[in-house]
Curated annotation (Swiss-Prot):
Topo IA-type catalytic domain sequence ranges: 152-580
GO MF terms, alphabetically ordered: DNA binding; DNA topoisomerase type I (single strand cut, ATP-independent) activity; magnesium ion binding
Record-level GO BP terms: DNA recombination; DNA repair; DNA topological change
Organism, scientific name: Staphylococcus aureus (strain MRSA252)
Start and end residues of each stretch annotated as Disordered: 691-711
EC number: 5.6.2.1
Cofactor: Mg(2+)
Name of the protein this chain belongs to: DNA topoisomerase 3
Residues forming the catalytic site: 305 (o-(5'-phospho-dna)-tyrosine intermediate)
Binding site for Mg(2+): 8, 104
Gene that specifies this protein: topB
Site (Interaction with DNA): 60, 167, 175, 307
Length: 711
């Protein structure tokens, strides 16, 4: 009898097979005399569509809503049905005694496996592999500590409840809004509050009125002292009067105080923090960061599990620090890492906290030493950031003297503040940081002359527009960005982790871009006209971050066995009925403000011009038509003159590439450029390798250009 191991992806199945020496390769699985390891391809089973309940529901009609099945059905996904049949046969095989679930250790990973097992009708015992990295050592250790699968039943119930609730709310709200207003409109329990978050920030900026204020400083022996005051001066004349009082008056040093202080490194990375920093440093979006991180985790095995919301490690990891540090010696941080090899680490360090780790600990390097030449440019940047943060967390604090010099002149107090570094500590890892010395020439009681006075004019600034990084953080902590009637609501939002989860937020932002509810202009995210109208037409409850946080709180309670999934689903059904009735009875109107005179080639109706993340697109106004045409999109092809990215207009042989500098070239010229760059003929293998580069080439212009080449 054998144990069947079910992994989430083929790559993880191969890693498990390698770690456990399961060497016999079969069609869709690996096998030895103890184990069989097979895989899903992400989800193999999903929720049925409305028309799979009733073929009459294929056509969207307002009168058919709400669609609330008595029992939710699941179906096998067509394009991966072959692998499902393989997995099913193995589950039902008489030589298989039990199932080891080895999908991702989290809510969604549990759902992937359980939907398959339920669809097959499995009755065999379950065990669970729960690991945070897929290195050989981690897998082998995990198999020595397999858990009883029943321990994760509540996790599955929470995952299933989330999936079914999203289906019930999303299908009905989207169909109701679309059929009511004859427009492609979409609602969801996470996406709609996110639009509201962006809209609230946009309104704050639009309503902001700048105010002028003034500050006064004195220069003494080359050092600038600032006027100490509890108020902001909006009247320049007040400061000018103070300056007049200071003329021909000497000052006196009232005190020179030195206080020794320490600063500590930032927390280890969770996914949201890492995505935010990648955008801040390199303008790499959250989705691209997650994909790159997944590659570092699965393919290279040099970092731990990506989809974590924790900034801490568990105390049982203390003894693994040295081997992880050893792995980082392959990086440019080897000189900073080397002294840490002789340091003793304790579970009392602030980075170790069992109470602040739920499913997975913070993202840190594994014990696998990377082959740096194997990493892409983006993978290298991301890995370096993780290593930098990890090493900083293990280093000593940064120490400095905070010096405050207080000056009195004509009854007014001025202050000079300087920080003098005494111990670099963790800041030694960053270039440009060094020990500083301040030869401040002041002593208490000194009489000093004022060499210059300076009144500076300032202006208050509005809050910044969200970018892809800061929007993620706002989704995690929406209570910091919206006004709430009751403080307990802020606590609810904080406890539940805000809108969405670390695993879903990047996808939500991406979806909002694709549905033209939000747009990015020069890195500033704004709500489109369509997004604003969605907020106006949607039921108010569905636009509130608080509501989705309360739902998430209940899902967490289900996960902990403290709330019934059935109760939650019934609440979602009642909520959906109210939403649909509200939309049906609404007398509001939807207006296309981007309607063009271009006729749809499929149905003849006028098309709508929409902005996408990378350009513009024409979309048929009829939701049932679904015809789309690219108008323009930014590509990764570079201008031969100024090296900026070219924008593609049109498609096929008629396509034209244009640059902001004025350069323009036809598709034929681009083809020729590609040929000469590749020394003539381009092989299929070379082209496939080029197109698969993990460097954000999702909208690669050469997909169109190269298909016309005679390869």
């Amino acid at each position: 009898m054998k144990s069947l191991i079910l992994a989430e992806k083929p790559s993880v199945a191969r890693d498990i097979a390698d770690a456990l020496q399961i060497n016999q390769k079969r069609n869709g699985y690996f096998e030895n005399n103890q184990y069989i390891v097979t895989w899903a391809l992400g989800h193999l089973v999903t929720n049925a569509t409305p028309e799979q309940y009733d073929k009459n529901l294929k056509e969207w009609r307002l009168e058919d809503l709400p669609i609330i099945p008595k029992y939710m059905k699941t179906v096998v996904i067509g394009k991966t049905s072959k692998q499902f049949k393989t997995v099913k046969a193995l589950i039902l095989d008489n030589k298989v005694k039990d199932i080891i679930i080895a999908t991702d250790a989290g809510r969604e990973g549990e759902l992937v496996a359980r939907l398959i097992l339920d669809k097959v009708g499995n009755k065999k015992p379950l065990r669970r592999l729960w690991i945070s990295s897929v290195t050989k050592k981690a897998i082998q250790q995990g198999f020595k500590n397999l858990k009883d699968g029943r321990q994760y039943n509540d996790l599955y119930y929470a995952a299933l409840a989330r999936s079914e609730a999203d289906w019930i709310v999303g299908i009905n709200a989207t169909r109701a809004l679309t059929t009511k207003y004859d427009a492609q409109l979409s609602l969801g329990r996470v996406q709609t509050p996110t639009i509201q978050l962006v809209n609230t920030r946009q309104q704050e900026i639009n309503q902001f009125k700048p105010q002028q204020y003034y500050t006064l400083s004195l220069t003494v022996k080359g050092f600038d002292f600032q006027l100490e005051s509890n108020q902001r001066y909006t009247n320049k004349e007040t400061l000018e009067q103070i300056v007049n009082n200071l003329k021909n008056v000497d000052g006196k040093i009232k005190s020179v105080a030195t206080k020794h202080k320490k600063s500590y490194p930032q927390s280890l990375y969770n996914l949201t923090d890492l995505q935010q920093d990648m955008y801040r440093r390199y303008k790499i979006g959250p989705k691209e960061t997650l994909n790159t991180l997944q590659s570092l985790y699965e393919r290279h095995k040099v970092v731990t599990y990506p989809r974590t919301d924790s900034n801490y490690l568990t105390t049982d990891m203390v003894d693994t620090m040295k081997e992880r540090i050893q792995a980082t010696m392959a990086t440019t941080y080897k000189d900073q890492a080397r002294p840490l090899m002789s340091k003793t680490f304790s579970s009392k360090m602030s980075i170790f906290n069992n109470q602040k780790v739920s499913d997975h600990h913070a993202i840190i390097p594994t014990e696998v030493r990377p082959v740096m030449s194997d990493l892409s440019n983006r993978e290298l940047k991301l890995y370096d950031m993780i290593v930098e943060r990890f090493l900083e967390a293990l280093m000593s604090p940064h120490e400095y003297d905070a010096i405050t010099v207080t000056l009195e002149v004509a009854g007014h107090t001025f202050v000079l503040k300087e920080n003098v570094t005494t111990v670099l500590g963790f800041k030694s890892i960053r270039q440009g940081e060094s020990i500083t010395e301040m030869q401040q020439p002041f002593s208490e009681g000194d009489e000093v002359k004022i060499s210059k006075t300076n009144i500076r004019e300032h202006e208050t600034t509005p809050p910044e527009y969200f970018n892809e990084g800061s929007l993620l953080k706002a989704m995690e902590n929406p209570q910091n960005f919206i006004q709430l009637k009751d403080k307990k609501y802020a606590q609810t939002l904080k406890q539940t982790g805000g809108i969405g989860t670390v695993a879903t937020r990047a996808d939500i932002i991406d979806k909002l871009f694709n549905m033209n509810a939000i747009e990015s202009r020069d890195g500033k995210i704004k709500v489109t006209s369509k997004g604003k109208q969605i907020l106006e037409l949607a039921p108010e409850e569905l636009t509130s971050p608080l509501l989705t946080a309360q739902w998430e709180e209940k899902l967490l309670l289900i996960e902990r066995g403290k709330y019934q999934a059935k109760t939650f689903i019934n609440e979602m059904k009642d909520f959906t009925k109210d939403v649909v009735n509200g939309i049906k009875n609404s007398d509001r109107k939807y207006k296309h403000d981007n309607l063009t005179t271009t006729e749809c080639p499929t149905c003849g109706k006028f098309m709508i011009k929409v902005k996408t993340k990378n350009g513009q697109m024409l979309v048929c106004q009829d939701p049932s038509c679904k015809t789309k045409k690219n108008v323009q999109r930014k590509t990764n092809a570079r201008c031969p003159n100024c090296k900026k990215k070219l924008t593609l207009f049109g498609k096929g042989k008629e396509a034209v590439y244009r640059c902001v500098c004025g350069h323009s070239e036809t598709q034929a010229h681009m083809d020729q450029r590609m040929k000469s760059k590749s020394s003539g003929k381009v092989s299929r293998k070379e082209m496939k390798k080029y197109m698969n580069k993990n460097e954000g080439l999702d909208n690669n212009p050469f997909k169109d250009a190269l298909k016309n080449l005679n390869l």
